[in-house]
Amino acid sequence: MSTNLHWQSFGQGPDLVLLHGWGMNGAVWQQTVESLQADFCVHVVDLPGYGFSAEHHGEDLAQIAAMVLKDAPEKAVWLGWSLGGLVATHIALNAPQRVSKLITVASSPKFAAEKPWRGIQPNVLSAFTSQLLEDFSLTIERFMALQAMGSPSARKDVKQLKQAVLSRPQPNPESLLVGLNILADVDLRDALISLTMPMLRLYGRLDGLVPIKVATDLSQQLPHTQQFVFSQSSHAPFMTEHDEFCAQVRDFAQD
């Protein structure tokens, strides 16, 4: 069995790595790749346990990050969506020489709510965990619906996410469980202060998983970082407001 994760590279220019979220795979970036490959060499990986990397498995955030770094470009702009944002942030904190700039999309240094911090209610995460053990494809479908909820194009977004997921092998249930545990337990809030590279945080105003209050709180904690809020988007702004999303990434990653 190969120990290498599934990577694809498109276009030419500065290196840009895209990391997908929980339950998904690299196919979610297809439209983004098509728009950005004229300006960047875009690298897309299926995280351990997902898509064409389904036979691989990382036990925790540190191991997942190490597996991703193994075949990643020497130095790149890293963009992580949702759970992928935690992976990208972990890499930026622990291997800063590999990360020229960091972009997080609909992501949070701590996904679980814990007053006064806003986030996903722990009971929602534990419900997903118990559902996962019974029927993981239904659980992923529910998670997709939750991600798109609130967006004016919710139905279209869910359809697009679903097509992407179904176009590659099903995720490995063990890795799905690890991912939910990461979302429930990881807290990088205090660590963020030590980030050295430029950072852009992108949010959807209507996001039910990463409440917009997270953006405000982090702006105060990280005044040297940039942020942008997509007014019509929920958890997947790269689909809902695709052109504006690509413009934000382009402007930040190129300057």
UniProtKB/Swiss-Prot annotation:
Complex and partners: Monomer.
Entry keyword annotation includes Transport: no
Name of the protein in question: Pimeloyl-[acyl-carrier protein] methyl ester esterase
Cell location: Cytoplasm
Reaction(s) this enzyme catalyzes, per UniProt: 6-carboxyhexanoyl-[ACP] methyl ester + H2O = 6-carboxyhexanoyl-[ACP] + methanol + H(+)
GO MF, one example: pimelyl-[acyl-carrier protein] methyl ester esterase activity
Species this protein is from: Vibrio parahaemolyticus serotype O3:K6 (strain RIMD 2210633)
HAMAP family, A to Z: Carboxylester
Main location class: cytoplasm
Similarity annotation: Belongs to the AB hydrolase superfamily. Carboxylesterase BioH family.
Pathway assigned in UniProt: Cofactor biosynthesis; biotin biosynthesis
Entries under InterPro entries matching the protein: AB_hydrolase_1, AB_hydrolase_fold, AB_hydrolase_sf, BioH
Keyword Cytoplasm on entry: yes
SUPFAM superfamilies noted in UniProt: alpha/beta-Hydrolases (SSF53474)
Binding residue positions for substrate: 22, 82-83, 143-147, 235
GO cellular component: cytoplasm; membrane
GO biological process: biotin biosynthetic process
Function recorded in the entry: The physiological role of BioH is to remove the methyl group introduced by BioC when the pimeloyl moiety is complete. It allows to synthesize pimeloyl-ACP via the fatty acid synthetic pathway through the hydrolysis of the ester bonds of pimeloyl-ACP esters.
Entry's EC annotation: 3.1.1.85
Catalytic residue positions: 82, 207, 235
Gene name of this polypeptide: bioH
TM annotation in the entry: none
PANTHER family per the UniProt record, alphabetical: AB HYDROLASE SUPERFAMILY PROTEIN YCLE (PTHR43798:SF31), MONOACYLGLYCEROL LIPASE (PTHR43798)
